[in-house]
């Protein structure tokens, strides 16, 4: 049975935690569409085009994964791609409450769309895009948390913008 799942997020930037979930989801479903949300209210560091490109690079070895940007309601994006499943990651109990509300709202808007929750590998359980950006901003080594191309892109973004530098 062909099952297409959407893994939505802002991915600003994509981390090893995201990449691990994508790879594991790709083993569970016929096709994964990584939907990168425009998310202007979050004021992303990387443009939508940059985030899509970085995610494409990180997932290039996965034949059943496609990366696309989107704006608007997630349920409409899922309908457009004829997906029946949403993949969501849960790092901690604090994620659960928000994700539970989101899953119920999505189910109300699109009753045939199921949410499937995956927990991270232990070594990725603390990684978030926000923490990775904070470490990179202060010149820390993020190579253990992101793909080398993402680490390089962060270095370029923060070059000359670090606290204490003019």
UniProtKB/Swiss-Prot annotation:
InterPro entries xrefs: Cyt_trans-like, PPAT, Rossmann-like_a/b/a_fold
Binding site for ATP: 10-11, 18, 89-91, 99, 124-130
Enzyme class per UniProt: transferase
Example of a GO cellular component annotation carried by this entry: cytoplasm
Reactions this protein catalyses: (R)-4'-phosphopantetheine + ATP + H(+) = 3'-dephospho-CoA + diphosphate
SUPFAM superfamilies named in the record: Nucleotidylyl transferase
Family: Belongs to the bacterial CoaD family.
Annotated site, Transition state stabilizer, chain positions: 18
Gene that encodes it: coaD
Gene3D superfamilies (alphabetical): HUPs (3.40.50.620)
Main localisation: cytoplasm
Pathway: Cofactor biosynthesis; coenzyme A biosynthesis; CoA from (R)-pantothenate: step 4/5
Cofactor: Mg(2+)
Function (record text): Reversibly transfers an adenylyl group from ATP to 4'-phosphopantetheine, yielding dephospho-CoA (dPCoA) and pyrophosphate.
Matching HAMAP family: PPAT_bact
The protein's name: Phosphopantetheine adenylyltransferase
Subunit structure: Homohexamer.
Binding site for substrate: 10, 42, 74, 88
Top-rank lineage group of the source organism: Bacteria
Localization terms from the record: Cytoplasm
Listed Pfam families: CTP_transf_like (PF01467)
GO biological process, one term: coenzyme A biosynthetic process
